[in-house]
Structures are given as C-alpha cells and as structure tokens.
C-alpha cells in the first residue's frame, strides 16, 4: 500500500480543519510547526482551484494565526504586520457578514498597540459592509473605546 502524499492530503483538508490544527499547535506552544503549517495554509489561498469565498477566509485566518505566533514569540512588529495583512483580504460570505476575527487585535491592544488595531478595522470595513444598525453601532463603539484607550468586548468576534 502506497503512503499518501502529505501535501495532497493537506490540500484536500477543509479550511476549518486546518485552522483548528494550527490552533491546537499554538495552544501546545509548538511555534515552529504552527508557523510552518500556517505558511502552507496561506499558500493554499493562492491555488487556482481554491474557490473565492474560501480564499478570503484562508488569507484572513492564516495571517491572524501567523500574527499570534509572532506575538507569542515576542515579535510585536511582525504581529502588527500580520494583523494588517489579515485585513487586506477581499472577504468572504462569513467575514462580510459576521466580521473579522479580533483575537490578535485584542492581544495587540493589551500590548498598547491601538493605532494598528484602528488601521486593521479600517481595512476590515472594506469587506465587512453589512449595514444592520446594531452592527454599525457595535463597530463605532469599538473604535470609540479603542481611541479612549480601552479594550472593547469583541464578543463572538474573538472566536470566528
């Protein structure tokens, strides 16, 4: 029996499973392996057969994960850059409606990095265009609180 090609198996894995695998590696502080897998995850977004909505999710979440790894290793500048790269996605049905993941942003706010988080939110508003009044008010409240030096309650956006 022939051993399956690891890269072929990886390419067939659903996005949510790859993300969950990297999350487990981060929780176990397997930084180098998590960084390697997150890099492969990001490359998956560049594949021509990758559908558009998944491409946006992959770009967003891979950069989020790479930023969390960088921050855990003490590289704040790289973490800030990864946050901004996460915001440069064209979006997806999920990101466009539920909004961006804010876990890395929260961690950077805890490190006193308000400006990069405000810039990230501006980038996210390009794809997060849902116009329901409660969401508009929530986004405005986040910006207000960040400008006041507070850390907003990002609620479910910490786990999307």
Language-model features: where?
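Structural signature of alpha-solenoid helical repeat junctions
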Residues: 13, 51-58, 96, 116, ...
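Terminal, low-structured helical/coil segments at or just beyond the last alpha-helical repeat
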Residues: 114-160
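Flexible helix-coil transition and linker loops at the boundaries of alpha-helical arrays
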Residues: 3-10, 43-56, 89-93
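Residue register of alpha-helical TPR repeats
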Residues: 16, 59-61, 99, 119
């Amino acid at each position: 029996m022939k051993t399956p090609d690891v890269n072929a198996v990886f390419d067939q894995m659903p996005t949510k499973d790859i993300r969950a695998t990297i999350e487990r590696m981060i929780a176990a502080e397997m930084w180098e392996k998590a960084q390697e897998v997150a890099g492969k995850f990001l490359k998956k977004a560049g594949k021509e057969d990758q559908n558009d909505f998944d491409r946006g999710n992959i770009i967003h979440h891979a950069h989020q994960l790479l930023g969390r790894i960088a921050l855990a290793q003490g590289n704040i500048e790289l973490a800030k850059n990864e946050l901004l790269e996460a915001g440069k996605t064209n979006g997806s049905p999920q990101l466009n409606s539920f909004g961006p993941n804010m876990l890395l942003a929260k961690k950077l706010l805890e490190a006193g990095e308000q400006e990069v988080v405000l810039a990230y939110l501006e980038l996210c508003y390009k794809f997060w265009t849902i116009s329901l009044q409660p969401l508009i008010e929530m986004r405005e409240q986040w910006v207000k609180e960040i400008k006041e030096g507070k850390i907003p309650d990002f609620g479910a956006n910490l786990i999307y």
